[in-house]
Amino acid sequence: LEPELVTGMGTAADMENVAIESLTYKELTVTAIVTGGIETNGGRVGDPADYYKPAEKPDKLGTINIILILDMPPGTLARALVTCTEAKTAAIQELLAGSNYSTGLATGSGTDQTIIVANSDSELYFEGAGKHSKMGELIGKTVTKAVKAALSKQSGLNPKTQHNVFRR
């Protein structure tokens, strides 16, 4: 492997609990590969911070990791990342997963990571990846479904277990 062409993600999640979802519309395919667990690190954006530590890297490894594969050139990657993050947050909030640091619902963990893989040679081009576009719809559906599946596999977090108010 050429070091300048590869990347990695760290996680405490069991790789056997990975969730993979893929959707296709006409010539467009979106695939989400997700590992996840937020039972010990789930938090809400804006919660009180655990630390202020200028350093090379934090102590904890990533917990909700998403690899999003898009069959398109990298022109709309920034918006695709926003849509992916919104979908992850929607999945967590639909599961009513609480923050471990405040009384709010979690929006993720403190160490989430996302990698978007785009085909730079693709002849497909889309003007956007937001909620009003088909690309955004596919990103939203694949990521939401994969995040829910990964959290259920890794942590047992699913609508059935969250139905009991005493568990939440």
PLM regions: where:
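A structural signal for small-residue-enriched, beta-sheet-centric alpha/beta enzyme cores
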Residues: 1-168
